[in-house]
Amino acid sequence: MGDSVSSSSRVSVHQSLGAGSVADLLLWRNRTGAVILLISSTGFWFLFERAGYNLLSFVSNVLLLLVAIFFLWAKSATVLNRPLPPVPNMEIPEEFANKAADDLRVWINYVLSIASDITIARNPIRLLQVSLVLWAISYVGTLINSLTLVYIGVLLSLSFPIVYEKYQDHIDEKVNSTSKFVRNISRKFPLPINKEKKHQ
């Protein structure tokens, strides 16, 4: 009985990841895409981190190669009366730029609201949360560089969702018990009460 209740209230990992192509990729339902992502990210990490290749020189060499190939293709096409190379329209649509600007504005406003919550409202819990996150980022930054951190993020994003989907009940049970434990501990700390005078 308890199993049927927990399975009926269980949220699908595929649905929570958006139920689209990204969810299929992260849950290895699109095995080809997941393998390509894993191999390409490993190749880039090895190329830039272990082989010591520079990102700027890599990008400039790739662009130089593409420009040379398209130039030679276009010149040979005019000489041999062949069609020109199919170069896509290299232009950012206005709708895409507006949507990106709106999304960026939402994130900036969220960060500013957190800063306002810390400074103006003097929320000590939010200050502690932000301080811990910033300290953790700083500490991790001293241990590894950003490219390795991105590579670890790719590896975790390809492994954690599938593990969570397989062992969702056990993980949820442990997270709930940990959350209850943390809540019980945090209740023992007194919170300052804001006493504001009301002006009428």
Curated annotation (Swiss-Prot):
PROSITE patterns: RETICULON
Record-level GO BP terms: response to bacterium
Segments traversing the membrane: 33-53, 54-74, 143-163
Encoding gene (name): RTNLB11
Name of the protein in question: Reticulon-like protein B11
Predominant cellular place of this UniProt entry's protein: endoplasmic reticulum
Keyword Lyase applies: no
Species, as recorded: Arabidopsis thaliana (Mouse-ear cress)
Membrane topology recorded in Swiss-Prot or TrEMBL: Multi-pass membrane protein
